[in-house]
Design a protein with these regions (language model features):
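Radical SAM enzyme [4Fe-4S]-AdoMet core and its adjacent flexible, acidic
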Residues: 1-13, 178-291, 300-305, 311-317
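Conserved alpha-helical substructure of the radical SAM core
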Residues: 2-156, 161
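A generic "binding-loop/recognition-motif" signal
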Residues: 72, 173, 310-313
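Short, flexible helix/strand-to-coil boundary loops that buttress conserved ligand/catalytic motifs
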Residues: 80-83, 154, 181, 308, ...
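Accessory C-terminal segments flanking Radical SAM cores
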Residues: 271-363
């Protein structure tokens, strides 16, 4: 990765480019054109709101990550959520209600949040929450989904509410995807991607990056396939070891160096997709972006956490506001510590720091 790479500028330019291209392609679609024009204006208003808070000494991140359910219809190999008991098919946890999420999204819009990533579990299992998100058209909601529940009814909701942007999980080719997510998954999700492309729905892809699939998913053939299916963004997310014996699947320094060079090449080429690496791109943003520096995570029960891979919390959104959560004791201590500061090698800065984080929570 070139030393002068500006991740924030790249993402902003990429989103603006996608909106511009989508506008050009949607001149015969008044519904989509109206949304894109409205969102472009809303993004400017959100930036102004964040600037006003900054003038008062309060930093507002433009991103949130919200895990809206702990249930999932798949049992993927090496799933971090299941291995850490964050995914619960019995649905015994006291999840935030649809009304709770509506309030949180309202607050996010008021303080200037522009993007809210919806995850799970499988977020398509919480249609009521998706309907709440759809009403906040000034926020773009990338929905990280396994892609198997995109029924006609769900696609109709997305088609009518273009601020919901599906990000479909795919692990590489058919063999690699089905090996992790179950037989037949690849054919189902690629068919659903084709259906979204036919409807002109904006969507992307998410790849869990491992030592086994890195060559495939960064190769020309795979990326050309994603473009042909209509994907406009590709997220590369480092595999976090969930099960004993899978440590060798986690990208090391060699893989991260390779990915950085490959993304540098791709980002310099004229392309219809934008590329995001997590957490690798953080090393070009003056350290880890968690705990409100660039984003924070809300778990399905309302806990405000530094990031999805740091499941510790001392504040719950069921009982407090987003603004208050940003100044929680944990987040404040973490931002003042050296755990987030400075550049890191690309590996998750907080993974494996359970004792330090627990101490900051007073546990």
């Amino acid at each position: 990765m070139s030393a002068g790479f500006d991740l924030d500028r790249y993402l902003t330019d990429g989103v603006e480019s996608i909106v511009k291209d989508a506008l050009a392609a949607s001149l015969k679609n008044p519904k989509e054109t109206a949304f894109l024009l409205s969102y472009a204006l809303a993004s400017k208003r959100a930036a102004s709101a964040r600037e006003k808070f900054a003038a008062e000494g309060k930093h507002i991140p433009s991103f949130l990550i919200a895990s809206i359910t702990n249930r999932c219809n798949l049992h993927c190999a090496g799933c971090y959520a299941r291995a850490n008991s964050l995914c619960d098919d019995a649905d015994t946890a006291q999840l935030l209600t649809d009304e709770d999420w509506c309030r949180i999204f309202d607050e996010a819009a008021q303080i200037g949040v522009s993007f809210c990533l919806l995850a799970g579990g499988e977020p398509m299992l919480r249609r009521g929450v998706l309907e709440c998100a759809a009403k906040r058209r000034e926020i773009l909601f990338p929905v990280f989904t396994n892609g198997t529940l995109l029924s006609e009814n769900m696609l109709e909701l997305i088609d009518q509410n273009r601020n919901l942007v599906p990000i479909v999980s795919i692990e590489g080719d058919e063999r690699q995807t089905d090996a992790r997510r179950g037989a037949g998954t690849y054919q189902k999700l690629t068919a659903n991607m084709e259906r979204m492309h036919e409807k002109g729905i904006l969507f992307g892809a998410s790849v869990t990056l491992t030592t086994e699939n890195i060559q495939t998913v960064t190769g020309d053939a795979f990326l050309s396939m994603l473009r042909a299916l209509g994907a406009k963004v590709a997220f590369f997310v480092d595999y976090v070891p969930a099960d004993a014996g899978t440590e060798t699947l986690a990208p090391g320094d060699a893989e991260r160096d390779f990915l950085a060079r490959r993304l540098d090449e791709l980002r310099k080429e004229p392309d219809s997709m934008i590329y995001v690496s997590f957490p690798g791109d953080e090393q070009f943003s003056d350290g880890c972006l968690a705990a409100g520096r660039g984003f924070f995570h809300i778990n399905p029960t309302g806990g405000a956490e530094p990031c999805p891979f740091s499941p510790v919390s001392d504040t719950n959104l069921k009982h407090t506001s987003l603004l208050a959560a940003l100044d929680s004791p944990l987040f404040s201590r973490l931002r003042a510590s050296e755990l987030l500061s400075g550049h890191h090698t690309g590996a998750c800065a907080l993974f494996g720091k359970d004792e330090e984080l627990a101490a900051m929570c007073g546990k």
